[in-house]
Amino acid sequence: RKFLSLVGVMACATVRAQEKKVDGGLAVIEQKKIPRRTTPITPPGSLAVRNMEAHCTGCQLCVAVCPNQVLRPSGKLMSLMVPEMSYERGYCRPECTKCSEVCPTGAIRPITKEDKSSVQIGHAVWIAANCVVNTDGVECGNCARHCPTGAVQMVHKEPGNPDSPRIPVVNEARCIGCGACENLCPSRPFSAIYVEGHQNHRTV
């Protein structure tokens, strides 16, 4: 009897776990995986990866106040517990400066919303093999629609052929690395477009 009860409990737990992965009971949701970035992404106001690592004490105040769950502590040995950015759960909204307001050490310096809009912490990179245009044969354009700076544009896959599907092209000079494109890309498990960080932040 105890065995049957245990089996019943385990079965219920399995069902509940599966329900959490289903969107409204219609489709299974596959969680996004973190892309392999050559350079980590650090928040606007941190100036550079080296500055962030040199001044951060790992207090996690910035992680705690980030409303979009973009910041998380690094698990790398050389930068252990130093927050870095990733866009599986959200993206860095241009109007948010919360992390720069709470940093007590200067790892992330105070920055205004106006200044933040011109700071390039990284740039978007499109991976053709992951894009639904190529994997599923459907048009999307989610990345272009949600880019706050207009850095992502849709162009015909075959130049001169108006009937060919459209694919994204990134204007690196306008991209600020906010991650809206990466976060809202429907491709799974890896986004078809992701942000590569900059060692030193730039101005656009």
Residue ranges: model-predicted function:
Residues 1-204:
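Non-ligating segments of multi-cofactor redox enzymes
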